[in-house]
C-alpha cells in the first residue's frame, strides 16, 4: 500500500493553523474517530487499491466559465482592464460594472448537457473513473447546496450538475470524483473590486462589491452577490499585478495575501462536507497546496478527516476514498 505523499506531510507540518475551526460536525467525535484533524493522524491513511490500479480517468472541467468560451479564468480576467477577456466581455455583454460574472452565470443554461450520453462515450474510451467539477474559483456550487445560495439548482441552469454526473457515472460502474476549487474565491475575485483607469467608465466600480440591497427589481433580487464574490475585504498586496495571486496561492501570511475570515473558512467547510455527505464521491481533488486554506485554517484537515472516517465506517473498517490536490 502507498502512504500519503511525504511532500504533503512536510508542507502540512510547516505552520499551525491561524484559525482553528470552532464548529464540529454534528455526529463527529474526534476523540473516538480513527482519523483526527491533524497531520500526524492523517499519516496513517493508505491509498485504496482501486486508485492505485486505475490508470485512466476523465475530468469534465465544465461550469459557467465555459459560457463565454474564453478560458477557465474568465471570471477573473473579465475584470482586468485591457485584457483579452475584458475586451471580449465589453463587446459581448457590456461593461463589468453593469454586467458582471453573476450575470454570465444567469446566461449559462446547460440546455444541451446530456450526462448519460457523455458517460457512455467516456466509458467506451476505457475510462475507469470520472471527475466532475463541483465548483471553480468563481464560487458557484454546481450542486444543491444549503450553505451557498449561489448554486446551479437556484441560478443559471437550475440543475443539479454534480448529481447528474454522479448518477450517470455510478450507473456504469465508474468511480466518481469531484474537484473543488472555491477556497480561492477570496483572492481570485479581487479584480472585481477594481474600476477602469481610462475611458468613459473611468472610476466606475465593477460589480465586485455590490450587495443584496442592490438587487431590488433585478433578476438576482434576494441573492447576495457577496456570497458569490466574497469581496467585502481589503485587497491583497500588489493585487493590481495580475500575476501576484500565484505567489499568494499558498496563503503565506508574509506574502501580503488578504487573509480570509473565519466565517469564510467555516462556510467553505460546510459546503464541502455537504458535498461529500450527499454525493458520496470516491475521490475529492482540491485545487490547493496541501489542503484548502492551510495554514491559515484547519478546515481542510477537518474535511479530510471527516471524509476518511465516513468511508472507514461504510466499508467495514477500510478507507476506500481518495483526497488529492495540486501539490
Feature-to-residue mapping (PLM):
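C-terminal segment of classical bacterial N-terminal signal peptides
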Residues: 21-23
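Mature catalytic domains of secreted/periplasmic carbohydrate-active enzymes
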Residues: 12-15, 25-327
Amino acid at each position: 500500500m502507498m502512504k500519503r505523499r511525504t511532500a504533503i506531510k512536510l508542507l502540512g507540518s510547516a505552520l499551525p493553523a491561524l484559525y482553528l475551526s470552532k464548529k464540529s460536525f454534528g455526529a463527529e467525535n474526534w476523540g473516538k474517530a480513527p482519523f483526527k484533524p491533524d497531520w500526524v493522524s492523517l499519516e496513517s491513511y493508505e491509498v485504496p487499491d482501486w486508485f492505485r490500479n486505475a490508470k485512466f480517468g476523465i475530468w469534465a472541467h465544465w461550469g459557467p466559465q465555459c459560457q463565454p468560451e474564453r478560458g477557465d479564468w474568465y471570471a477573473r480576467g473579465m475584470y482586468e482592464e485591457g485584457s483579452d477577456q475584458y475586451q471580449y466581455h465589453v463587446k459581448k455583454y457590456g461593461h463589468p460594472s453593469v454586467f458582471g460574472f453573476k450575470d454570465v452565470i444567469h446566461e449559462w443554461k446547460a440546455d444541451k448537457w446530456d450526462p448519460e450520453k457523455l458517460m457512455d462515450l467516456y466509458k467506451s474510451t476505457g475510462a475507469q473513473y470520472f471527475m466532475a467539477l463541483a465548483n471553480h474559483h468563481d464560487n458557484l456550487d454546481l450542486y444543491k447546496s444549503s450553505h451557498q445560495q449561489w448554486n446551479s439548482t437556484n441560478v443559471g441552469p437550475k440543475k443539479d450538475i454534480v448529481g447528474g454526473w454522479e448518477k450517470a457515472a455510478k450507473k456504469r460502474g465508474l468511480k466518481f470524483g469531484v474537484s473543488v476549487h472555491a477556497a480561492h474565491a477570496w483572492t481570485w475575485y479581487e479584480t472585481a473590486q477594481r474600476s477602469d483607469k481610462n475611458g468613459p467608465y473611468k472610476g466606475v466600480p465593477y460589480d465586485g462589491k455590490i450587495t443584496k440591497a442592490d438587487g431590488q427589481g433585478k433578476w438576482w433580487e434576494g441573492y447576495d452577490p457577496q456570497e458569490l464574490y466574497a469581496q467585502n475585504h481589503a485587497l491583497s498586496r500588489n493585487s493590481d499585478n495580475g500575476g501576484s495571486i500565484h505567489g499568494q496561492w499558498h496563503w503565506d501570511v508574509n506574502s501580503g495575501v488578504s487573509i480570509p475570515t473565519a466565517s469564510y473558512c467555516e462556510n467553505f467547510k460546510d459546503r464541502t462536507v455537504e458535498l461529500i455527505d450527499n454525493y458520496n464521491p470516491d475521490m475529492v481533488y482540491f485545487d490547493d497546496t496541501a489542503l484548502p486554506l492551510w495554514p491559515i485554517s484547519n478546515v481542510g484537515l477537518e474535511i479530510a478527516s471527516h471524509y476518511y472516517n465516513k468511508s472507514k465506517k461504510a466499508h467495514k473498517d477500510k478507507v476506500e476514498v481518495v483526497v488529492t490536490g495540486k501539490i
